């Protein structure tokens, strides 16, 4: 199942295996049917972000080969595109900032993205923020805020906190995909009478 087939503009394919006990299986379970994606990447990303998420001229100079952006895996995504797969790989430099990467934010569906990726907007290139990543996993801003607040008890530096939020997003299952799976299970009363 792919997140982009269930309302989230991210190309994130995952295999789901559904097991149903024999004594309650009525044999009519069907995986949810994909539907047309209406949201685009620009609909999910924050409009106003801290300047630290934008690549500076020095960062851009460090990128060895600008032609690498022609390679789909090293592409700068545009606002009408679908995000590549959010993963847990992040880059925090020794100086405490976010490291430059040749994988940034061009056009069309990409096959894979890591959390170092960014967005091209107003001729500026930026990385996804932790909130961007959470939203691309189907979470609401309130969910992100609760997770952020729960991490404040651990005496983390700001960079450690940001790293944890990126990793939590990258390790998550897209909420909308699970929601549609559960709807199909509920349609056939699989969960009726079962204590969860």
State the predicted function of each range.
Residues 25, 143-146, 191-194:
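Cytochrome P450 catalytic domain signature, combining two hallmark sequence patches
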Residues 89, 139-141, 168-172:
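Short, loop-centered acidic/histidine patches that primarily coordinate divalent metals
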Residues 17-21, 86, 136, 170, ...:
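Conserved proline-anchored active-site loop of SAM-dependent methyltransferases
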Residues 1-93, 98, 102-108:
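Class I S-adenosyl-L-methionine
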Residues 21, 90-92, 132, 140, ...:
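A broadly conserved detector of short glycine/acidic/proline-rich loop/turn motifs that flank catalytic sites
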Residues 162-196:
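Generic C-terminus detector
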Residues 81, 131, 173-177:
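Generic recognition of stable, solvent-exposed alpha-helical segments in well-folded globular domains
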Residues 109-160:
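FAD-binding beta-loop-beta segment adjacent to the flavin cofactor pocket
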């Amino acid at each position: 199942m792919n997140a982009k087939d269930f309302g989230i503009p991210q190309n994130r394919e995952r295999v789901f295996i559904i097991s149903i006990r024999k004594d309650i299986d009525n044999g009519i379970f069907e995986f949810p049917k994909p539907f047309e994606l209406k949201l685009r990447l620009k609909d999910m990303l924050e409009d106003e972000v801290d300047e630290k998420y934008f690549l500076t001229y020095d960062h851009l100079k460090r990128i060895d080969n600008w032609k690498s952006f022609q390679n789909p895996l090293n592409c700068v995504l545009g606002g009408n595109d679908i995000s590549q797969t959010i993963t847990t790989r992040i880059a925090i430099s020794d100086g405490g900032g976010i490291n430059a990467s040749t994988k940034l934010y061009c056009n069309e569906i990409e096959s894979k993205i890591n959390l170092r990726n960014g967005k091209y907007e107003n001729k500026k290139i930026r990385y996804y923020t932790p909130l961007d990543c959470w939203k691309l996993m189907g979470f609401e801003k309130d969910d992100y805020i609760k997770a952020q607040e729960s991490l404040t008890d651990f005496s983390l530096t700001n960079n450690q906190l940001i790293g944890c939020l990126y990793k939590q997003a990258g390790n998550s299952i897209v909420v909308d995909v699970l929601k549609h799976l559960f709807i199909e299970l509920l349609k056939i009363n699989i969960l009726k009478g079962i204590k969860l």
